Structures are given as structure tokens and as C-alpha cells.
Amino acid sequence: MKKLLWVALACALFALPSHAQTTPAADASVGYSYLRVTGSNGVNLNGVSGSVSYNANDWFGLVGDLGVYHGSPFGIGFTATTYTFGPRFSYRKDSRVTPFAQALFGGFHFSASSGGFGASSNPFAFSFGGGADVPLGSNDRIGLRPQFDYIGFRSNGSTSNSVRISVALVFHIGQR
């Protein structure tokens, strides 16, 4: 019986440091995204987005984000792809919920087609936004990530303003 108590005490003591290390080494997410591309009439697109991030410490990480969206308003097929990279700043204090903000830069591929005719462009894109990682249940390794981003892209000397709203599953990998 004494041996069992010593084993239980040792397990509890070894578990304390591992519980305190809550910063994942990396994150991967995939989910649904709604993209509103503004312009003279505006276009609503639905799609999927995903990201992979490396967390250098508990507040700073580098993220790559990819999204593919499609819609057919006005009988015209629109497809947009965003691919951006940059820093993410997270706040991991006193809560299981981890809010974050990010500033990403990259490209925006946009194509439209109707009746066998099509056009496309590939302008510079930038994205500023944020969200929060909310654990699902008692498992800190899988969570839900609601996110809101402003996406701008430069084409022909002007900036088009867009908004993306996403809900994704996030998977926390390893520990820092």
C-alpha cells in the first residue's frame, strides 16, 4: 500500500510540470470560410481555409494560411484563392481560451468564367485579423477556432477590401 502511495505521489509531481506547459509547438486548422469580395456589386464566396503555424514561444508564432472559395452570382463562376504568410501574436494567460491577432502578406488569385470565356488576376494581398482557439471539452489538443479577417488586395493601382469569416477545427501539435 505504501508503494502505491509513493507511485501515486510521484505521478502527481511529474504531471505538474507537464500541465504547466500549455503552449503547443505547432497548430494546424481546417474549416469553413465565407469571403465577401467587395467591389461595385460585391461577391459572396464560400469555401475552405486552413493554416499551419509554428509557435516560437507562448506569444509569437509564424503562420501560413491558404483559402479556396467559390461562388456563382449573376451566372458567373468566381473562384478565389488566398495564400498568405506572417506573424501571429497569441495571449495564453489565465484562461483555456487563446485569443490571437495576425498580420499576413502574400497573394490573391481571382478567376471568373462564363459561357466558355474567362479572366483571372493574381494581385498582392494582405490580411489583418484575429480570432480565438477554444478547446473542445477537456481535450486541449483539439479546439474550435472562430476567426475574422480583413483582406485587401492591390490590383491596377487600387485596393479592394474584403472580409473573411471562418470557423475551423484546430489541432495543437506537440508542446513548447
Predicted features, each with a name:
Residues 1-23, 174-176:
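Cleavable N-terminal export/targeting peptides
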Residues 6, 156-167, 173-176:
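Short glycine/proline-enriched turn or capping motifs at secondary-structure junctions
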Residues 9-13, 95, 148, 152-154, ...:
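Enrichment for repetitive, rod-forming helical segments
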Residues 10, 32, 163:
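Extended interaction regions within the primary functional domain
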Residues 19-56, 62, 66-70, 105, ...:
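Short glycine/proline- and aromatic-enriched beta-strand/turn motifs that initiate or cap beta-hairpins
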Residues 19-21, 37-43, 73-78, 114-121, ...:
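Outer-membrane beta-barrel domain signature
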Residues 20-25, 39-42, 59, 92-98, ...:
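Short loop/turn motifs that connect adjacent beta-strands in outer-membrane beta-barrel proteins
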Residues 51-146, 150, 166:
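Gram-negative (and chloroplast) outer-membrane scaffold detector with strong preference
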